[in-house]
Amino acid sequence: MLIKIPSRSDCSESEVTSETLYLSRRRLLGASFAGLALASGLPRLGFADEQRYAGVESVPAPGWFAEKLPQTRWQAVNVQGEAITPFKDATHYNNFYEFGPNKGDPAENASALKAEPWSVVIDGEVGKPGTYALEDFVKPYQLEERIYRLRCVEAWSMVIPWLGFPLADLLKRVEPNGQAKFVRFETLQRPEQMVGQRSGFSVIDWPYMEGLRMDEAMHPLAILAVGMYGRLLPNQNGAPLRLVVPWKYGFKSIKSIVRISLVREQPKTTWESIAANEYGFYANVNPQVDHPRWSQARERRLPSGLFSPNVRDTQMFNGYGSEVASLYSGMDLRKYY
């Protein structure tokens, strides 16, 4: 079923911006990855409907992706003051610490990742556990284009047109039992292809882990994405399969997923394990709850430069409050951040 997202949550694909300002993330991950850098180059992408967006390169797609595109449900719903971030900027300003700590590292290093073949393990409190080849994993679902805001915890944001399907559709198919209260996600651990996982300076205990409460995972806005900008996901953006939860800070939208587990207890997520006072389990976008070292009241919508700042007020739940606020009814969102 096509989810019709209200206009205040949608963005027009006809408006395009670019981004030039790079902001280094906090120094928590520390030292340089110099000497470990891999050969640069964009990963294999897919022929699709990339002519809808400027500057999108064309590279042949795997058969399963090409077969699904003709039935894709494309969206283009206008909202005042929003603009889609250009493809090049969205693919060259990333946090993906498996490939390095700096914003340009994923685009430079992620070409080393071999995203084919790929399999996903489904386990835990489900009636249909198993290990699925990606093409079989995606086969039952019709792709939809979802134009979502992406708000990073670092107080910058983008607008990205994703291609994917509702996470809820997958969860229903694997038949969670009554003990399933949370969903835990796990990123690939393959240090021979992910330079960041080889660094002795990283504070991350690989593999990267994330989690959602079951009702959050079942919400129709939460999707599993396999593409963006009318084509296959680039490696640096989480190929071949990533989570997108638009009302939460970007680190919740885990990339390069290899395992989805339905569990009884709230999972301990990666950033929560590193600094729970800075990165809570819920991580809902909230302008009233600051990061300990910076304000969350405003954000830089990329592009944004010293002499041409593109700064705007941050919206509660990233502008999706009318859809998701009821999930947190009665909760103290200053405590459960």
Swiss-Prot record:
Q: Which GO terms describe its molecular function?
A: metal ion binding; molybdopterin cofactor binding; oxidoreductase activity, acting on a sulfur group of donors, quinone or similar compound as acceptor
Q: What class of enzyme is it?
A: oxidoreductase
Q: How would you describe the post-translational modification of this protein?
A: Predicted to be exported by the Tat system. The position of the signal peptide cleavage has not been experimentally proven.
Chief subcellular location: periplasm
What residues bind Mo-molybdopterin, as annotated? N94, Y97, E98, C152, T187, N237, R242, S253, I254, K255
Q: Where in the cell is it found?
A: Periplasm
Catalytic activity, EC: 1.8.5.-
List, alphabetically, the GO terms of the cellular component aspect. periplasmic space
Q: Which Gene3D superfamilies match?
A: Oxidoreductase, molybdopterin-binding domain
Endpoints of the signal sequence: 1-48
State the UniProt keywords alphabetically: Metal-binding, Molybdenum, Oxidoreductase, Periplasm, Signal
- What is this enzyme's catalytic activity, as reactions? L-methionyl-[protein] + a quinone + H2O = L-methionyl-(S)-S-oxide-[protein] + a quinol; L-methionyl-[protein] + a quinone + H2O = L-methionyl-(R)-S-oxide-[protein] + a quinol
Family that this chain belongs to = Belongs to the MsrP family.
How is this protein organized at the quaternary level?
A: Heterodimer of a catalytic subunit (MsrP) and a heme-binding subunit (MsrQ).
What the protein does comes down to: Part of the MsrPQ system that repairs oxidized periplasmic proteins containing methionine sulfoxide residues (Met-O), using respiratory chain electrons. Thus protects these proteins from oxidative-stress damage caused by reactive species of oxygen and chlorine generated by the host defense mechanisms. MsrPQ is essential for the maintenance of envelope integrity under bleach stress, rescuing a wide series of structurally unrelated periplasmic proteins from methionine oxidation.
What protein am I looking at? Answer: Protein-methionine-sulfoxide reductase catalytic subunit MsrP
The protein's organism comes out as Pseudomonas aeruginosa (strain ATCC 15692 / DSM 22644 / CIP 104116 / JCM 14847 / LMG 12228 / 1C / PRS 101 / PAO1)
Q: What high-level taxonomic lineage is stated for the organism?
A: Bacteria, Pseudomonadati, Pseudomonadota, Gammaproteobacteria, Pseudomonadales
Record gene name: msrP
